[in-house]
Amino acid sequence: MSTSAAPPIDRQRIRELIKREERVLNERTGRSAEMFKRANRSLSGGVASSYQLRDPWPIYLERGDGPVVWDVDGNQMWDFHNGFGSMVQGHAHPVIGKAIQERYAKGTHFAAPTEDAIAVGEELARRWGLPQWRYTNSGSESTMDAIRIARAFTGRDTVMKIFGSYHGHHDTVMVSIGVEYDKIGEPDDLASLPYGAGIPQATVDMTVAVPFNDVGAMERRLEKLIAQDRKPACVIMEAAMMNLGVVLPEDGYLQAVRDLTAKHGIVLIFDEVKTGLCIAAGGATEKWGVTPDMVTLAKALGAGLPMGAIGGTEEVMSVVKNGSVYQVGTYNGNPLGVAATRASLIEVLTPDAYAHLDALNDRIVGACDMVIQKYGLPGYAVGVGSKGCVTFSPTKITDYASFKANQDAELSDLAWLFNMNRGIFMTPGREEEWTLSVTHSEEAVDAYVEVFDELASDLMS
C-alpha cells in the first residue's frame, strides 16, 4: 500500500462522468425499476433491508453461480459484493449444496441439538483458540448476546466501542457510526450519537466511543470513566475496521488494547462478523496473533444461510453455562445452518483456499496501486485475505475522523457506477470493500483492475 501525492482532480469532470454513468445504469436496469415499483406496494422502501437501498432504485438479482451473478435484466457480473462479505465460498458451491440437500432429507428444524452443531463448535474452538461457543442467527444477534454476557460477567453496564464501527442493528451499538465530521468531537471525548431514530437516549449514554488505532485515547477515556464509577463491561471492536473500506490496525495497537483491557478487567470482544473466515482460517484473531476474551461471527460462517456464533473463554462463558445469562433462540444451531457451516469449514475453507485468496488479493491490490501511480490518482489500495478496497484519499485513513476528513465521496460514487456498468457487482455504499470468494480467479480480479484502469484514464483525460 502506498498513498499517491496526486494533482487535484477536475471536480466538474467527476460530476459529468457520474451523470453519464447514472444514465447508462438506469438504461441497463429497466426491469429492476419495474420490480422496485412492484416491491414498494408490499415491502417498506421496496427492499428487505435498508442497506439494500440505492437511488433511484436497487439492483434486483436473480441468481448466482460461483463468482458470478445475474440481475433481473440479464446483466452478468463478477461478484465482488458477495452478500456484504457473506459468500466467501462462492455461490451455489456444490459441497455446500450437497450438505444442505442431505440435511433437508433428514429434517430441517427441531429446536434440539444435533451432531453437526458439536462438530462446528469443535472446529471453531480449534481455529480461534476459544473453548466455549454458542450459536445465533446473525451478526446483530451475536454482538447483542456477547455484550449481554460481558455485562453479566462483570456486573457493569457501560459499553466501549470504536467510533465509526458498525456492530449490528441493536440499540446498544447503534451509536456513533455515521456522523458528520463537525459532530465527531475531540479524540479524548468523542460524541455518543444515535444512528437513526428510535434509540433511547438512556441507551446512547451507556455507549462510549473512542478512535481506532489510538490506544492512548482509549486509556485516557477509560480513566475518566473509572473516575466516574462507569468502568466499561466490555470493549467491542473490529480488529480491522471494515466499514470505512478497509482500515488496518497499526503495529502493536491490538496487543496494546489487549493489555489495557486485561489490566482493568474489561472483557475484550473482537467483532469478527466481517473478518472471521474471510481474512484467515481463524480470522483477525489468527492474522494478528491477539486473542480476545470473546469473538462474534456471522456472515461467511453460514455459507449463505443465516448463521452466527459467539466464542469465549471458559471464565467469561461460565455465566451462560451456569444459567445466569439466557442465551436463547428458536433457530440457534438450526440443522441446515450447522450442516452448511460444517461442510464449509471442513471441505471448502481449507488452507489451500486461504492461500488462493491471499494470492488473488495480493494481485488485485498490487495492480490497483499500479493504476493509481500510473494516472496520479489520490488514493491507495489496501487489502487482507479476501477483503480489500481502493481508498480515494490523499492521505492514509487510520480512523473515522481521518476517513470523514479525507475520503473523496464523489469519486467513490463514480467508481461504483463504473464497476456496475462494466460487469463488476460491488456493494452499494461508499464505505464498503470488495470480498473475493474461493471461486474467484485471476480472470475475475484482472477484470476489476481493467475497469479501474478505464475509470482512471477517463477521469484524467
Residue spans for each PLM region:
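Conserved N-terminal phosphate-binding loop of PLP-dependent enzymes in the Aspartate aminotransferase
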Residues: S2-S461
